[in-house]
C-alpha cells in the first residue's frame, strides 16, 4: 500500500495548481505524474483527495476528487506564548514538536531577560507546515510575530490564562493538576497571614473552585506563558497575576525554555476531552 502524499494548499478548494514549493517537491522529489493521487490540506480543517491532472515544467495542476472535512481533535484553543531562546534551533525544535503534539497558536514574547529580541517567523511557519503535514494535522497553528510582554498580557484578557515561573515567593499551583480539575483554594496555615501576592493567587483560585470536573467547560481558551532561560522577572510575574493570570509550576524539575514550552503544550493537550 502506497503512503499517502500530503501537500499544503491554503486555498485548495479554489485553486487547481500546487504552490511553487509544493509543486517542486511533487515533481522533482516524488516524481508524480498525471493520474497520481495525493492528499491536500488547507490548514483550516479540510483534507482533499486529488489527482494530478497535468504537469508542465515547474507547474503541477490537480483535480479535486473528494472533499474531506475533519473533526477537531480537541475542543479548546491551545495557545503557548514563549520567550525565544538565544539559539533559534531550540525554538524551531519546539515549534515542530508542539505541532506534532497538537496546539493552535504560538506567540513569541519579548521579556526583560530575553536573550533574543528578533525572530524570523517565516522560517518558523515553514517548520510548522512541515510538522503539520508529517503528523497529518488538519489545522495549521498560527505563528504570531514577537510582541512586548506588557502589551501581550494587556491584549489577552479572556479564557484560562497561566504564567509558569520558578519564584518561590509567588505561590503557584501545578499546571497539569489545574487543567485536569478545577483548582481548590490554597491551604491556610493557622495564624498565618497571606502576602499581597498570595492573596491575589488565592482569590483567583477560589473564584474557579468547584468539585465539578474542569472538562465540563468544553471548547475554552487555554493560554500558558513560558519565560526565557533566566525566567520572567518578578515584576513581570506580578504584573501577569494582577492581570488575571494564574501562577503555576510545570512540575518538580527545572526545565529548559523549549522543554518547558513543550511540557505546557502536552499538559494542555492531555487536559482536553
Q: Regions from the language model: what does each represent?
A:
Residues 193, 200-203:
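Polybasic, lysine-rich low-complexity intrinsically disordered segments
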Residues 1-70, 183, 202-205, 210, ...:
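N-terminal positively charged helical leader segments and presequences
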Residues 62, 140-144, 247:
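Generic structural signal for residues in well-ordered beta-strands
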Residues 71-166:
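RNA substrate-binding interface of SAM-dependent RNA methyltransferases
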Residues 233-273:
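Structured adenosyl-cofactor binding patch, chiefly the S-adenosyl-L-methionine
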Residues 162-180, 221-239, 243-249:
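Active-site/ligand-binding-proximal alpha/beta "capping" segment
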Residues 189-191, 215-217:
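Glycine-biased, low-complexity coil/linker segments
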Amino acid at each position: 500500500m502506497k503512503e499517502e502524499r500530503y501537500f499544503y494548499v491554503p486555498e485548495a478548494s479554489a485553486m487547481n495548481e500546487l504552490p511553487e514549493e509544493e509543486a517542486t517537491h511533487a515533481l522533482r522529489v516524488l516524481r508524480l505524474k498525471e493520474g497520481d493521487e495525493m492528499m491536500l490540506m488547507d490548514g483550516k480543517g479540510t483534507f482533499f483527495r486529488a489527482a494530478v491532472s497535468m504537469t508542465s515544467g515547474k507547474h503541477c495542476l490537480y483535480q479535486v476528487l473528494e472533499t474531506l472535512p475533519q473533526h477537531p481533535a480537541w475542543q479548546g484553543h491551545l495557545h503557548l506564548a514563549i520567550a525565544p531562546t538565544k539559539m533559534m534551533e531550540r525554538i524551531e525544535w519546539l515549534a515542530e514538536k508542539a505541532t506534532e503534539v497538537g496546539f493552535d497558536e504560538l506567540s513569541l514574547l519579548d521579556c526583560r531577560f530575553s536573550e533574543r529580541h528578533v525572530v524570523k517567523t517565516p522560517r518558523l511557519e515553514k517548520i510548522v507546515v512541515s510538522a503539520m503535514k508529517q503528523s497529518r494535522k488538519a489545522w495549521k497553528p498560527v505563528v504570531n510575530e514577537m510582541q512586548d510582554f506588557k502589551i501581550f498580557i494587556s491584549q489577552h484578557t479572556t479564557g484560562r490564562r497561566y504564567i509558569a515561573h520558578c519564584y518561590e515567593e509567588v505561590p503557584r499551583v501545578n499546571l497539569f493538576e489545574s487543567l485536569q480539575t478545577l483548582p481548590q483554594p490554597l491551604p491556610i496555615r493557622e495564624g498565618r497571614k497571606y502576602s499581597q501576592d498570595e492573596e491575589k493567587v488565592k482569590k483567583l483560585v477560589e473564584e474557579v473552585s468547584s468539585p465539578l470536573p474542569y472538562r465540563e467547560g468544553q471548547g475554552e481558551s487555554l493560554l500558558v506563558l513560558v519565560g526565557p532561560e533566566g525566567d520572567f522577572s518578578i515584576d513581570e510575574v506580578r504584573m501577569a497575576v494582577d492581570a488575571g493570570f494564574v501562577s503555576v509550576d510545570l512540575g518538580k524539575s527545572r526545565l529548559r525554555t523549549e522543554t518547558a514550552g513543550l511540557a505546557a503544550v502536552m499538559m494542555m493537550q492531555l487536559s482536553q476531552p
